[in-house]
């Protein structure tokens, strides 16, 4: 009798309209209940029964109700699900399949079934890619997912690599080789095969894309010739190989191995500047003065070169430092190394005075066994040979930036604008509070930024430097010239790694247009978007595999008395993030591990300090001693505790 009652319908509509609603993001907990966070300011409790309708990370609209003086959120409408495509581990029970997402706050198994095209018979512990297809807030009875791809079985030793690549939807293998002949008839190449070019790389490097040759001019200056491998001689624009390289955008370097942008036949053979092999290259010649200034005689050309020696960073560094365990093969190579060292010193001095030089940070290299186990982690400090190559490549990239700007007005540029204009006032306030006077407007200029960086680099600690980093913008990829504040340079365009970076291949084609006097087309903006997105995904993949391997490596140390020296890299409300200096692992120290009485300890991201009873006990960039308290393998988190 009530179902068609207009008064009842009107009353329901009124109640619906009058019920307060909020939109926010669900935050799950390990205890079954959750919270709806609204604008990062306010949160509402979601009881366990209501949490069964949603997932951590879902953006929803919820109705608000009061229960025993507490405001409770009841999920009503799904705005945007947290999970769409994801990876997880399959559970098989009585021929029924479910999948647990590989995420620290998603512990519940989701019912699932393979899509029709997938023929793999899933077993307990298998890793898979899944797509959510049902959600309770969409009117479905329960969550459900489709299994769309089998990744690997649970016993595979290389799970960290395969799962991470699948998570980020990245390729597992090198691209297939397509028949590819040298294709540059319109390009005249000069023969430089008689010159004593050398490559300097790691011992294991196969994709060598730069070779160097120096001529002493006898007046204190040098003529530096940088030869860069020329894959665009084999890869025609918009060909199958080119489209593959454009999609991949970069060679993906992961612990233990890489997945190249180009087929290995090209990257490790035909284009690689192997010793005593004739190779097509693009060449940049520039005179460098005794003071390290790049002269304005920059010239690009196409050439043939033949590297006379594959040198290794550590060998060259040892020899230059007076350790004679290794010797150059002849006096000509010895002379090249000596001249390159002089250029490096001159350019480094020039950049310290007129641009910016990054502080040296060590690289950490995983030494892996045949089954992917971590045998050791090697700390590789940047040595003189690394700096030689770095200075020559920076010089070459500055030359390309200037040439592209002058002749075309476009290219693939690396741009960094320093401080975010919206945050520069805050940066100036933090600097002032720490005794450094700074004019916000001056900080937005390249000279002002460089002056500040030099001042910060001269301070005894990294505290202030780390405090103001959050007010800076990220480096971007642009098709038009712009400054690179991080390097302290007016313009910067890379072309020195075309085997492993698609943006460098684009710049090669533009430089060839300048060399031949042909028309060049400005790169599409979509290319910069693809490059930026792939760079982000590759970095996340490298970090994720690293976290997994660090967890495996440090698990035996959990609960032991082994001490590690660590640097505080971030302070959050919940505790400290530290980097272990012996191996590069990042660990978290919860605030209760710092001081037992929670109300007496304040961890402040704003001030970059930890205070106990008002006294500062830790600051960002401090070095402290820690022990490993726990390693959570399911989330790959390392939990540390300060040594009292």
Curated annotation (Swiss-Prot):
State the gene name recorded for this protein: rnb
Q: Is RNA-binding among this UniProt entry's keywords?
A: yes
Q: What is its main location?
A: cytoplasm
**Similarity field:** Belongs to the RNR ribonuclease family. RNase II subfamily.
> What EC number(s) would the UniProt record show?
3.1.13.1
Q: Tell me, what's a Pfam family for it?
A: S1
**Catalytic activity line of the entry:** Exonucleolytic cleavage in the 3'- to 5'-direction to yield nucleoside 5'-phosphates
Q: What class of enzyme is it?
A: hydrolase
Residue span, RNB domain: 189-516
Q: What is this protein called?
A: Exoribonuclease 2
> Which GO cellular component does the record give, naming just one?
cytosol
Q: Which GO terms describe its biological process?
A: mRNA catabolic process
UniProt subcellular location: Cytoplasm
Which SMART domains is this protein grouped with?
CSP, RNB
Where the record annotates domain S1 motif, the positions are: 561-643
What keyword terms does UniProt attach to this protein? Answer: Cytoplasm, Exonuclease, Hydrolase, Nuclease, RNA-binding
Any idea which GO molecular function terms this record carries? exoribonuclease II activity; RNA binding
Q: Does the keyword Hydrolase apply?
A: yes
Q: In UniProt terms, what function does this protein have?
A: Involved in mRNA degradation. Hydrolyzes single-stranded polyribonucleotides processively in the 3' to 5' direction.
């Amino acid at each position: 009798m009530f179902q068609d009652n207009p008064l009842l319908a009107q009353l329901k509509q009124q109640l619906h309209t009058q019920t307060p609603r909020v939109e926010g993001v669900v935050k799950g907990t390990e205890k079954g209940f959750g919270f709806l966070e609204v604008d990062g300011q306010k949160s509402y409790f979601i009881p366990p029964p209501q949490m069964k309708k949603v997932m951590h990370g879902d953006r929803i609209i919820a109705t608000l109700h009061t229960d025993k003086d507490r405001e409770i959120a009841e999920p009503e409408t799904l705005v945007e699900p947290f999970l769409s495509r994801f990876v997880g581990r399959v559970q098989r029970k009585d021929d029924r399949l479910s999948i647990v997402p590989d995420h620290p706050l998603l512990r519940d198994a989701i019912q699932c079934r393979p899509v029709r095209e997938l023929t793999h018979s899933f077993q307990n512990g298998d890793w898979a890619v899944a797509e959510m297809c049902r959600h309770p807030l969409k009117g479905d009875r329960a969550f459900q997912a489709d299994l769309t791809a089998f990744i690997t079985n649970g016993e595979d030793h290389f799970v960290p690599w395969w799962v991470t690549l699948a998570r980020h939807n990245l390729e597992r293998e090198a691209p297939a080789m397509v028949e590819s002949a040298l294709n540059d008839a319109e390009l005249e190449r000069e023969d430089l095969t008689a010159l004593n070019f050398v490559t300097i790389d790691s011992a294991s490097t196969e994709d060598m894309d730069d070779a160097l040759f120096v001529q002493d001019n006898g007046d204190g200056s040098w003529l530096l010739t940088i030869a860069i491998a020329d894959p665009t001689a084999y890869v025609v624009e918009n060909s199958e190989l080119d489209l593959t390289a454009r999609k991949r955008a970069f060679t993906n370097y992961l612990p233990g191995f890489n997945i190249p942008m180009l087929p290995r036949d090209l990257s490790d053979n035909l284009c690689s500047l192997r010793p005593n092999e004739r190779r097509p290259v693009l060449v940049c010649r520039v005179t460098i003065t005794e003071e390290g200034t790049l002269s304005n005689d920059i010239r690009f050309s196409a050439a043939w070169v033949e590297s006379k020696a594959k040198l290794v960073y550590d060998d060259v560094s040892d020899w230059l430092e007076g350790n004679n365990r290794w010797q150059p093969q002849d006096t000509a190579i010895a002379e090249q190394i000596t001249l390159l060292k002089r250029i490096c010193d001159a350019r480094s001095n020039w950049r310290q005075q007129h641009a910016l030089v990054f502080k040296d940070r060590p690289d950490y290299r995983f030494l892996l066994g045949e089954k992917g186990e971590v045998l050791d982690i090697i700390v590789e400090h940047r040595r003189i040979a690394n700096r030689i190559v770095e200075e020559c490549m920076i010089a070459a990239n500055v030359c390309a930036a200037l040439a592209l700007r002058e002749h075309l007005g476009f290219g693939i540029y690396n741009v960094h604008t320093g401080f975010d204009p919206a945050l520069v006032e805050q940066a100036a306030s933090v600097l002032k509070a720490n005794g450094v006077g700074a004019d916000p407007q001056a900080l937005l200029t390249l000279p002002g930024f460089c002056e500040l960086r030099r001042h910060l680099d001269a301070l005894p600690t990294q505290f202030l430097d780390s405090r103001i980093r959050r007010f800076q913008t990220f480096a971007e990829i642009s098709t038009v010239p712009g400054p690179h504040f991080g390097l302290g340079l007016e313009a910067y365009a890379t072309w020195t790694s075309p085997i492993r970076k698609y943006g460098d291949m684009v710049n090669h084609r533009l430089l060839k247009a300048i060399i031949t006097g042909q028309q060049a087309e400005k790169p599409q903006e979509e290319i910069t978007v693809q490059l930026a997105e792939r760079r982000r995904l590759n970095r996340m993949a490298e970090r994720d595999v690293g976290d997994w391997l660090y967890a495996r490596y440090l698990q035996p140390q959990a609960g032991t008395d082994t001490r590690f020296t660590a640097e505080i890299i971030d302070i959050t409300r919940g505790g400290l993030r530290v980097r272990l200096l012996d191996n590069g692992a990042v660990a978290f120290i919860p605030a209760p591990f710092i001081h037992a009485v929670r109300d007496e300890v304040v961890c402040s991201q704003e001030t970059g300090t930890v205070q106990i009873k008002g006294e500062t006990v830790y600051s960002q960039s401090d070095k402290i001693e820690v022990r490993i308290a726990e390693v959570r393998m399911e989330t790959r988190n390392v939990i540390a505790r300060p040594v009292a």
